[in-house]
Amino acid sequence: MPTIGIHASHEQLSPARLLEAVRNAEAAGFRAAMCSDHLAPWSERQGESGHAWTWLGGAMQATSLPFGVVTAPGQRSHPVVTAQAIATLGDLFPGRFWAALGSGEALNEHVTGDPWPTKRDRDARLLECVDVIRALLRGEEVTHDGLVRVDRAQVWSLPAEPPALYGAAVSEETAGTVGSWADGMITVYQPVDVLRRVIDAFRDAGGGRAPVAVQVHVSWAEDEETALQIAHDQWRTNVFGSELAWNLELPAQFDEAAARVRPDDVTEAVLVSADLGQHTKWLLELADLGVDAIYLHHVGKEQDPFIEAFAEHVLPELAS
């Protein structure tokens, strides 16, 4: 069975509350954690966005969990800076850290004032960043002149073994590209038949038996109405297609775009149910795809009731 972890949502909880949540999750039986490197939340209602890399040092010291981060080198974060951060966490916490590299969203990257590239150029930039980061993690001095520029850079403090570099992918096309270079893939929950094709595209393109992790957005409460209300309040800005999600620049723009999203529309992006047996069924179907890790993201701001309920009723079923 896959490792069951928790997704720590910087966009919704303050760094201190998020640290408390992952400590409670570990104590309850979750076996891993991940987060995303965001500068801004998806909605003004979410209202937070701590610095992921700073927080990771504290969270990994405070727990014994393995952690991963989804990040987008190339604009807001220069690949040399990203490589140094990866190396430092890899040295501090050997074997406990991975980083997933993606092409990013304007929501986080527009702040540099540089033009927002096309998806084609962002994908090309990402591949350049992967090459730069890998070379730096091997201890090489790097000079590069392309969509990113590097002048005689070196990362001086290196771990004995470099952390795994995953690729972030949602579509079959991107998964195929990721399979050609990544040590693993992180994707998001979709209908099982769609997700199977994404995973197959990754494996067929060279991913082979490399790890596949899936982030799953869930909403649980003791009654259906509350579970749906939580999902609609906190995650209705996350139901859009990739083109819109990539290109909006401000949380207020996401809120405006989501003004007509109905509660039932959110169930396309979030597994909503008050029935813990139903959540177990959904996750068992996902496990049957042969994924290596599932990271559960309860989209509400109150994490403890979710952690306690899933630890008692869902995690044991997934471990059997």
What are these regions (language model features)?
Residues 1-320:
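Active-site-adjacent structural elements that line small-molecule/cofactor binding pockets in enzymes
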